[in-house]
């Protein structure tokens, strides 16, 4: 068992099994996540006998840093080896007064969004809680001495977090535990492409911030861009999102909308999007499309993006354009790929699809 898999509740269960008091969980949380201790022998306020028993039951294993890239804008991307020898990518984005860590939740992605490089890599497996919180642990260590620190976490790396809630929720609990990393729940954002059934379960287990990868204002277009929409259409997704913040005063949903030239960026799309969101407390984040090899889309012109923003604002919506960060190291939105042994044969199907289009 990996010690990083255990949040406070799991640690209490472990110590109960060992006949120990619940306060031991607090001790271990502080040693591991705040004092950065990786061996039980260094936990000096725990008896030698208990340390030995713990060592028999659990060990602390971290993802291995295979490579680090630093962008001209200060964005950092790490390639991390996880169990089984595959690799994921984690990105740190510095900004004035804040630092956002973008973590992955799967090796590859179980979904098949047509504009996302990660999706083209296929899918292998879910990450464990240890592999998710391990990204935070490693990033914290890598940033030591740089003057940068993690103030926010977004689950916007590789994978669909809501298809891995069993591992994501304990990781979130560790991030927000005052005896571990102590982030405010408002500073942690889980992004989903719209797995409605899991969104309802997420609402029962946490109240961190929610972002939704929307990308289209109607079902016909969203079916094409975000295929999971065929199973979880907008008439189910939008009410589920509204319900998530219904009992959370002063909270709002962030809607992610990638701008694709001639596809979803016309005036009528903006008006339709405003009608779709209605009076739900919202922020629309327009994302300039980040190209990748083989992509069949282009980014909307800047003038078109600004016009889209103005139309949304005319409807009373808060709308912003995301500043692209880390593009020179392929660390921007939709560009993370890692090293994935595809179990879905998605890459092979994509090649065959392109050959058919070219008439070969």
Curated annotation (Swiss-Prot):
The active site is at 89 (proton acceptor), 333 (s-methylcysteine intermediate). GO terms for biological process: rRNA base methylation; tRNA methylation. Disulfide bonds join 102-333. Its EC number is 2.1.1.192. It catalyses: adenosine(2503) in 23S rRNA + 2 reduced [2Fe-2S]-[ferredoxin] + 2 S-adenosyl-L-methionine = 2-methyladenosine(2503) in 23S rRNA + 5'-deoxyadenosine + L-methionine + 2 oxidized [2Fe-2S]-[ferredoxin] + S-adenosyl-L-homocysteine; adenosine(37) in tRNA + 2 reduced [2Fe-2S]-[ferredoxin] + 2 S-adenosyl-L-methionine = 2-methyladenosine(37) in tRNA + 5'-deoxyadenosine + L-methionine + 2 oxidized [2Fe-2S]-[ferredoxin] + S-adenosyl-L-homocysteine. GO terms for molecular function: 4 iron, 4 sulfur cluster binding; metal ion binding; rRNA (adenine(2503)-C2-)-methyltransferase activity; rRNA binding; tRNA (adenine(37)-C2)-methyltransferase activity; tRNA binding. It is an enzyme of class 2 (transferase). Binds 1 [4Fe-4S] cluster. The cluster is coordinated with 3 cysteines and an exchangeable S-adenosyl-L-methionine. InterPro entries: Aldolase_TIM, Methyltransferase_A, RlmN_N, RNA_MTrfase_RlmN, rRNA_lsu_MTrfase_RlmN/Cfr, rSAM. Its cofactor is [4Fe-4S] cluster. This is Dual-specificity RNA methyltransferase RlmN. It comes from Alkalilimnicola ehrlichii (strain ATCC BAA-1101 / DSM 17681 / MLHE-1). The lineage of its organism: Bacteria, Pseudomonadati, Pseudomonadota, Gammaproteobacteria, Chromatiales.
């Amino acid at each position: 068992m990996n010690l990083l898999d255990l949040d406070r509740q799991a640690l209490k269960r472990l110590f109960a099994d060992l006949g120990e008091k619940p306060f031991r969980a607090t001790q271990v949380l502080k040693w591991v996540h705040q004092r950065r201790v990786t061996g039980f022998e260094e936990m000096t306020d725990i008896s030698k006998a208990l340390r030995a028993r713990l060592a028999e039951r659990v060990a602390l294993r971290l993802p291995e840093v295979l490579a680090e890239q630093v962008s001209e804008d200060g964005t950092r991307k790490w390639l991390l080896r996880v169990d089984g020898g595959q690799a994921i990518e984690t990105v740190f984005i510095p900004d004035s007064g804040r630092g956002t860590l973008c973590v992955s939740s799967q090796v590859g992605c179980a979904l098949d969004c047509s504009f996302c490089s990660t999706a083209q890599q296929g899918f292998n497996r879910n990450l464990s809680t240890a592999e998710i919180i391990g990204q935070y642990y490693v990033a914290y260590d890598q940033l030591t001495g740089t003057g940068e620190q993690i103030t926010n976490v977004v689950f916007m790396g590789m994978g669909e977090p809501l298809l891995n809630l069993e591992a994501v929720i304990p990781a979130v609990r560790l991030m927000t535990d005052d005896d571990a990393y102590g982030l405010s729940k408002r500073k942690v954002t889980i992004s989903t492409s719209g797995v409605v059934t899991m969104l309802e379960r997420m609402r029962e287990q946490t109240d961190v911030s929610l972002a939704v990868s929307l990308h289209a204002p109607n079902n016909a277009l969203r079916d094409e861009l975000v295929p999971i929409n065929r199973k979880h259409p907008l008439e189910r997704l939008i009410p589920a999102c509204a319900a998530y913040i219904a009992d959370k005063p002063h909270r709002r949903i962030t809607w992610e909308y990638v701008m694709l030239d001639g596809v979803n960026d016309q005036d009528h799309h903006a008006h339709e999007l405003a009608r779709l969101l209605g009076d739900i407390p919202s922020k629309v984040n327009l994302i300039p499309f980040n190209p990748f090899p083989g992509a069949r889309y282009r980014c909307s012109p800047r003038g078109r993006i600004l016009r889209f923003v103005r139309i949304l604002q005319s409807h009373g919506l808060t709308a912003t354009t995301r500043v692209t960060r880390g593009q020179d190291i392929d660390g921007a939105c939709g560009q993370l790929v890692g090293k994935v042994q595809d179990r879905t044969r998605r890459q092979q199907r994509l090649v065959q699809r392109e050959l058919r289009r070219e008439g070969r």
